[in-house]
Amino acid sequence: MAEQNQRTNTPDNGPEFAIQRLYIKDLSFEAPRSPQVFLEEWQPELNMDLATKVNDLGEDNHEVVLTVTVTVTMKESHIFLAEVQQGGIFTIKNFPKEEMRPMLGSFCPNILYPYAREAITDMVVRGGFPQLYLAPVNFDALFEQHEQSEEGNSGTEDRVH
């Protein structure tokens, strides 16, 4: 009965969004200066890089992979590198075409980031280093910035898709 009520309350052509699966696709931690680095005063410099990749899986299913790479250096020496590729399979159905890019480029990475951040933090602690607190990321602003840079490059032949 509940299924029938749910079906009748949602029009067949209305927008649908569902998380099908969240998973770690790749995980890597390198600490080339262990254990010597543990004897030094801890004054790290952190750099974080983000990237997203979208794969169309057909039937309104999309894989979004968020790659978070954290590199920590001290006195220009590489201390550790932690990287995670956090994946998700999302069903995105009946959304207007102009809303698909923001859904895949911003909304889905917003869902994936807390999982990636937790994986990075866990690796760093297990590597013997102090816990990292990675700041929240405004994927909406990053997506908008990316879209504007693509518009600015639309007249050049070196455009990257």
Curated annotation (Swiss-Prot):
Keyword vocabulary terms for this entry: Chaperone, Cytoplasm, Protein transport, Translocation, Transport
GO CC list: cytoplasm
Sequence intervals crossing the membrane: none
Keyword Mitochondrion: no
Subcellular location, record wording: Cytoplasm
GO BP terms, alphabetized: protein folding; protein tetramerization; protein transport
InterPro entries with a match to the protein in the record: SecB, SecB-like_sf
GO molecular function, one term: unfolded protein binding
Role played: One of the proteins required for the normal export of preproteins out of the cell cytoplasm. It is a molecular chaperone that binds to a subset of precursor proteins, maintaining them in a translocation-competent state. It also specifically binds to its receptor SecA.
NCBIfam families xrefs: PRK05751.1-4 (NF004393), secB (TIGR00809)
Family: Belongs to the SecB family.
Subunit structure: Homotetramer, a dimer of dimers. One homotetramer interacts with 1 SecA dimer.
Protein name: Protein-export protein SecB
